Regions:
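Positively charged n-region of N-terminal signal peptides that target proteins for export
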Residues: 1-5
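Bacterial N-terminal signal peptides
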Residues: 7-16
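Acidic, small-residue rich beta-repeat scaffolds with periodic aromatic anchors
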Residues: 19-63, 68-84, 189-292
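Structural motif
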Residues: 84-90, 152-165, 209-221
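Short N-terminal edge-element motif at the start of the domain
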Residues: 89-140, 146, 151-153
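Surface-exposed loop/turn elements that mediate protein-protein interactions on large endomembrane-trafficking
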Residues: 90-112, 163-180, 219-233
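Hydrophobic beta-strand segments that make up the repeating blades of beta-propeller
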Residues: 142-148, 202-207
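Short helix-loop boundary/capping segments
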Residues: 154-205
Length: 292
């Protein structure tokens, strides 16, 4: 038989648990608020494609959610390079149930980079990623990542934007700490490193425009609660269409680490994340997946 004290404590715990559960955000209500807000903005009822409750992971003061919606393609007046109608993607931050779908802090980054868009077009038409990534050891220092694409050209190419957001506890707001845009047709990549000696860094690989046709590699690092800043840029030796099964960032990793003083010839080769390669080798300063 439980003692009176035990029963009281148990009852208090049940009441506390019920109170916390009662404070949980109503995702359906939030989504409806976003759809209503976007309908007023664009005159089109969008469909919710992402809903992330940011409160638990970032331990936010207010209730924060990320809600992303897409306009139905058939109701859009915008066409892609192939003549197909394509609906815009809208990104909304929701604080205590109140959606902000203005995307002003995202658009500000485009203006800073002097990137403009065709009149009447939206910056986002395809969503590649909307998730939480970790920039510290043991899945710490979370960042919110959004990766999206502009309207596609006739060859399918588009501008791939990568945004990383950190939670500012003092301001109780999310803010952009990293932004860039690349193409997508030539093995470009922007990657937040989540393990190894470059944990928390962002690596970018993008093609050169003149011979020899290789790739530029950049490393961006964040210190304290500041934005990311570039700490390394070099022209790599990975060639276009060289047949290497590794991504450009992985093929260039030994050289990237060497230039940062984190690897030297004779050290074990860096193992790419999620690799299925049975044998890694070096060829002319580039890491290769050897199929033989």
């Amino acid at each position: 038989m439980k003692s009176p004290c035990t029963a009281i404590v148990t009852a208090m715990l049940i009441l506390m648990a019920g109170d916390v559960e009662g404070q949980a955000p109503d995702a359906s209500k939030t989504d409806k608020a976003v759809i209503s807000r976007l309908s007023v903005q664009f005159g089109i009822n969008s469909k919710i494609i992402t809903h992330l409750d940011l409160t638990p992971t970032f331990q936010t003061k207010s209730r924060w959610s990320l809600v992303i919606a897409k306009q139905p393609d058939e109701e859009s007046s915008v066409e892609d390079g192939g003549g197909n109608r394509i609906g815009a993607v809208s990104i909304c931050f929701v604080e205590n149930g109140e959606p902000d779908c203005s995307e002003e802090m995202l658009l500000a980054k485009y203006r800073e980079a002097k990137i403009s868009f065709v009149a009447g077009e939206h910056p986002f038409y395809e969503l590649f990623a909307s998730d939480v990534v970790f920039s510290g050891p043991g899945r710490t220092l979370p960042l919110l990542r959004i990766k999206s694409c502009t309207n596609r050209g006739f060859n399918g190419n588009c501008g791939v934007s990568t945004f990383l957001f950190a939670y500012d506890r003092n301001a109780d707001k999310f803010r952009v700490v990293f932004f860039n845009m690349t193409g997508r047709n030539n093995n470009e990549e922007t990657r937040l490193v989540q393990s190894g000696p470059l944990l928390g860094n962002v690596i970018v690989a993008y093609p050169t425009s003149n011979a020899p046709f290789t790739y530029f590699v950049e490393v961006h690092k964040r210190t304290s609660d500041s934005e990311y800043s570039r700490v390394l840029t070099y022209r790599g030796t990975t060639g276009y269409g060289d047949g290497n099964a590794l991504a450009v960032i992985d093929s260039e990793m030994p050289e990237t680490l060497r230039r940062l003083g984190l690897w030297k010839i004779g050290d074990p080769l860096p193992v790419p994340p999620n690799t299925r390669c049975a044998r890694l080798v070096m060829r002319k300063g580039v890491e290769w997946c050897d199929p033989h």
